[in-house]
Design a protein with these regions (language model features):
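Nucleotidyltransferase catalytic core that binds NTPs
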Residues: 1-147
């Protein structure tokens, strides 16, 4: 949310697009993630939440977007995101990438770390928007029951 809130103050319209990443195993489906993000961005009138299974560069072209905003937590994030920015620009020369560094209190966070903390019953209010903590805890509990 840190990056979304800051980017929404920079742009007249911000589209948050939930994409599919075959290399990740998300806790929520794409549709569920869209709904969760809509819930926590409801107070931001210039934010639209969407989803796509196409390449980001193609999605941006179709939507008429000229800038992609990416959040960075660490130097290792930059290496990966820089490569993606170059590829996206190659596919869609009208597309630029803007990098925003996460505020310092979020730099160490990762989704896997938050999942693990949640599995151990740690209070997640410092890590997640309060509106979605119950959804997160419910999903963790249902996964525990599977094992």
């Amino acid at each position: 949310m840190n990056i979304i809130r800051r980017a929404s103050s920079i742009f007249d319209k911000l589209i948050v697009c939930v994409m599919v990443n075959a290399g990740k195993n998300p806790m929520f489906t794409q549709k569920e993630r869209v709904e969760l993000i809509r819930r926590v961005t409801g107070d931001l009138p210039n934010v639209e939440v969407d989803s796509s299974n196409e390449l980001l560069a193609e999605y941006a072209r179709r939507r008429g977007s000229c800038v992609v905003v990416k959040g960075l937590r660490a130097v290792s994030d930059f290496e990966t995101e820089f490569q993606m920015a170059l590829i996206n620009h190659k596919i869609n020369p009208d597309l630029d990438t803007m990098f925003l560094t996460a505020d310092s209190q979020y730099m160490y966070l990762s989704s896997s770390m938050v999942k693990e903390l949640g599995a151990y019953g740690v209070d997640l209010s410092d890590f997640l928007p309060t509106e979605i903590i119950p959804d997160f805890q419910e999903r963790i509990e249902s996964r525990k029951k599977q094992f």
